[in-house]
Every structure is written in structure tokens, then in C-alpha cells.
């Protein structure tokens, strides 16, 4: 059974990690996938990889500035115009920082909030414009377990992810009247380039705090996105699902 057959789906941060895993799993399940990435070069590389894996599938790719509503709307609009609708929006793009509080500059904090919060807000806002008249759709926002429990360092990242959780719950309650569901996913420690780019001492701390004694794989998170985007999750909205292997920062 293809859980998202013919569902028009956009995945931000879709060129690597969780987003790229989601792109593959959604294609495997019949979705019409478009990916957003940070640069056109990254997008083109990911598109080439997907073309090799799925030569019969047409996957669109864009590199809009997620902090610009106009730029995001232009890209989202191209997808909706091509297919006549938008069914699923996965706001997955994000950045991290582990600077301790005393070393976080105003510019660094603002940048994290711009990408992780404003980017999600813009993605959700633009998706809503394409879904409201059809009165159906699913918006999935990537949060983090650190947005629930905090972290030992790097206040900007958990602050931004807590904001994503609040945005998700509030928006989910507001627009369910339009039959549009909004759900958050809060991953724990996932085996991605972003995670593995942390300093060795932070990676060591992660592994000690993992009851499963391993990091989660991107596909384990993407499978939850797949379920939430499907009709099997028709009663789930305005909440955040933790996929963390019992990890507590």
C-alpha cells in the first residue's frame, strides 16, 4: 500500500539528512516530491542522486531564501501550479549551534531564529495559501527533543525548536477548521551530517545519554513523517511527536 499515493509534497532541507531520506521514502510511497535546499548546487546534486535512484520519477528542486516569504511563495507556487494543488508541506530545514550562552552573539541568535522559526513560519504560511481553498492538507514541522527539554549548551537551537513546537500547536488548532492538519516531529540524536559535525566531546556526550546505545537513522524519522502525512493519521493535529529513542539532553 502506497501511503501517500499522488500526494504533492514539498520537503525543505530536502537535499540531505532527514529531508533526503523523507524524499526517498515519499517517492517510494507514490508521492510527487519537490525538494528545497540551501543552494542550487546542493539541490542539483540531490536531484541527480534521486534521478539515478528513480529514473522514471520527476522531482522538482528549488533553493529559495526561506527567510523571505516572497521567495518561498514563488517556489511553492511553482509546485502548486504544476500539479494543481499542494497536499503535504514538510518544513524540515534548520541549522544548529552549540555555543554556550555567554558566547552567543546577537547576530548568531537572530540567524538561528530566522532559519529555524521564520523559515518554518514562511513555509507554513505559503502552504496554507495553497491548501485553504481545497480545505485539505498536511503541514509537518521538524522540531527537536531539545525544544522540549533544552540542552546543556547552545541555547539558540532549543529556543528556536521550542518556538516551532508552539507555532505547530497554535496553528494546528487554528486551521483545523479548514481540514488542514499541522503536526510537529521532535527527533532525538540522528545520524546526519549536521549531528556528526559536532565536536568530539559533544558526540561523546550524546552517545552516553542514549539509552538505545545508538543514534537514530534518518529513515526512522522519515517514516514518522510518512505516517503523519497519510490518511492513517487523519485524527492527529496540533501536537508534536517525539522520535528520540528515550534520549534526554
Curated annotation (Swiss-Prot):
Presence of the UniProt keyword Ubl conjugation in the record: no
Sites where the protein binds substrate: 144
Coiled-coil ranges from the UniProt annotation: none
Catalytic residue list: 157, 161
Subunit note: Homotetramer.
Protein family per UniProt: Belongs to the short-chain dehydrogenases/reductases (SDR) family.
Protein name per Swiss-Prot or TrEMBL: 3alpha-hydroxy bile acid-CoA-ester 3-dehydrogenase 2
Lineage, highest ranks first: Bacteria, Bacillati, Bacillota, Clostridia, Lachnospirales
Gene: baiA2
Amino acid at each position: 500500500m502506497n501511503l501517500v499515493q499522488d500526494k504533492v509534497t514539498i520537503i525543505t532541507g530536502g537535499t540531505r539528512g532527514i529531508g533526503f531520506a523523507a524524499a526517498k521514502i515519499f517517492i517510494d510511497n507514490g508521492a510527487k516530491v519537490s525538494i528545497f535546499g540551501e543552494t542550487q548546487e546542493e539541490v542539483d546534486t540531490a536531484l541527480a542522486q534521486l534521478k539515478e535512484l528513480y529514473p522514471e520519477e520527476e522531482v522538482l528542486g528549488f533553493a529559495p531564501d526561506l527567510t523571505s516569504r516572497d521567495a518561498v511563495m514563488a517556489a511553492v507556487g511553482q509546485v502548486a501550479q504544476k500539479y494543481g494543488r499542494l497536499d503535504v508541506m514538510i518544513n524540515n530545514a534548520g541549522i544548529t549551534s552549540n555555543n554556550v550562552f555567554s558566547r552567543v552573539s546577537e547576530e548568531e541568535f537572530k540567524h538561528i531564529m530566522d532559519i529555524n522559526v521564520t523559515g518554518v513560519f514562511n513555509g507554513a504560511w505559503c502552504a496554507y495559501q495553497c491548501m485553504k481553498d481545497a480545505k485539505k492538507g498536511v503541514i509537518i514541522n521538524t522540531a527537536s527533543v531539545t525544544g522540549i527539554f533544552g540542552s546543556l549548551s547552545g541555547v539558540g537551537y532549543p529556543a528556536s525548536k521550542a518556538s516551532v513546537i508552539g507555532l505547530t500547536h497554535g496553528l494546528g488548532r487554528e486551521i483545523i477548521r479548514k481540514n488542514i492538519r499541522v503536526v510537529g516531529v521532535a527527533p532525538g540524536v540522528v545520524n546526519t551530517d549536521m549531528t556528526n559535525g559536532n565536536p568530539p566531546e559533544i558526540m561523546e556526550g550524546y552517545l552516553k545519554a542514549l539509552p538505545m546505545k545508538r543514534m537514530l537513522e534518518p529513515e526512522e524519522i522519515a517514516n514518522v513523517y510518512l505516517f503523519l502525512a497519510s490518511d492513517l493519521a487523519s485524527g492527529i493535529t496540533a501536537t508534536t511527536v517525539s522520535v528520540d529513542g528515550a534520549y534526554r539532553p
